[in-house]
């Protein structure tokens, strides 16, 4: 079960913690995990996931996490993932980007990392477009991987997670339909000749 067995100072049961890299992941994880977990993002809202360095308190707090959901190909993870896991080796790590078709980013001066003779450095990218959550197709994969990870962590609540995943899936599908509808209306409007 998701229970930690710990109680807070107020005497209530503390929820186990899942740490994610980014706020978009936090949205997916909270949408599916519901009230079973507390979800913490390593890169705070408004901070750059390419250049953010965690503060010491975050490294200490990471030790309280049951799992870490990584997104892959973000500068923060490339720079910090090994150190984070060395700091908290008991944490189960799940790659929520598994199965996503990545887009190569040939931006000469992108925000990513580029490997030159075996080393990475920021600010120069011929690598992967890291903003994988911006596609509804990818959002469905991220949500599916998050659902599977939660079921692995807490099999007893699989039906609860399934119901919440199904609800999120429908919201993403509705968003996709709305985007497609708006784009098709834009295309019709653009392609119609102006009449005088």
Please give the residue ranges for each predicted region.
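Extracytoplasmic metal-acquisition and chelation regions
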Residues: 3-187, 191, 195
């Amino acid at each position: 079960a998701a229970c930690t067995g710990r109680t807070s100072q107020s005497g209530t049961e503390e929820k186990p913690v899942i740490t994610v890299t980014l706020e978009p992941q936090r949205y997916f994880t909270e949408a599916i995990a519901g009230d079973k977990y507390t979800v913490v993002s390593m890169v705070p809202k408004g901070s750059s996931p390419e250049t953010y360095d965690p503060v010491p308190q975050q490294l200490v707090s990471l030790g309280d996490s049951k799992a870490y959901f990584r997104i892959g190909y973000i500068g923060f993870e490339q720079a910090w993932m090994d150190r984070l896991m060395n700091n908290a080796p008991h944490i189960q790590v799940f790659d929520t980007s598994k199965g996503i078709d990545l887009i190569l980013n040939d931006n000469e001066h992108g925000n990513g990392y580029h490997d030159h003779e075996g080393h990475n450095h920021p600010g120069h990218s011929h690598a992967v477009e890291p903003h994988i959550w911006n596609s509804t197709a990818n959002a469905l994969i991220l949500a599916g991987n998050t659902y599977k990870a939660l079921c692995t962590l807490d099999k007893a609540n699989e039906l609860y997670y399934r119901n919440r995943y199904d609800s999120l899936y429908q919201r993403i599908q509705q968003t996709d339909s709305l985007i497609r509808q708006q784009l098709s209306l834009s295309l019709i409007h653009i392609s119609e000749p102006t009449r005088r």
